[in-house]
Amino acid sequence: EAAFVRQMNLRARALGLTQTHFANPHGLDSGENYSTALDLAHLAQAALQNAQLRAVVSTKTAVCAGRTLTNHNKLLWRYDGCIGVKTGYTRHAGRILVSAAERDGRMLIAVTISDPDDWRDHAALLDYGFAVLGSDTPAYPQNRRIVWKNDCKKFWRAVQMSRAAKRR
């Protein structure tokens, strides 16, 4: 396990995840695991390039040894184009949701930490992102990361705008 965790941390550094450290392979509370929403978004972008992982996280149900396993990611069921990624909760970290969706060849990633309404907020963020970026002409060069970097006012304004648009 220790060798695997070393490899995880080396890969994190290679991906430029400067605010991430792994202490175990499963991510459960240890006091030594940490990351940021930005690093988790970068990690998701890299991970989704792996076709097998992408297939697993986007699977809604699977039958294994006669049992039906159901993915807990509600966005897979509710959000058009959702790829999935990571749901989770630990006592120390709280609720963390990393989701991605793809439409018209454009993929967006949303990350929230300790958001009590994360499913709805992710849908709102993704809706806002697809609306702002459009689908005809890329607004930014391909593969450029667009990040709001701690601009909470802009984040919540985007969520509120998307929620208001859905009510109309």
Label the model's feature ranges.
Residues A2-T20:
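Short, charged, amphipathic alpha-helices and their helix-cap/turn boundaries
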Residues A14-H21, D29-R168:
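Domain-terminus/edge residues, biased toward the C-terminal soluble/receptor-binding domains
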Residues E1-A2, T90:
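Glycine-centered helix-coil hinge/cap
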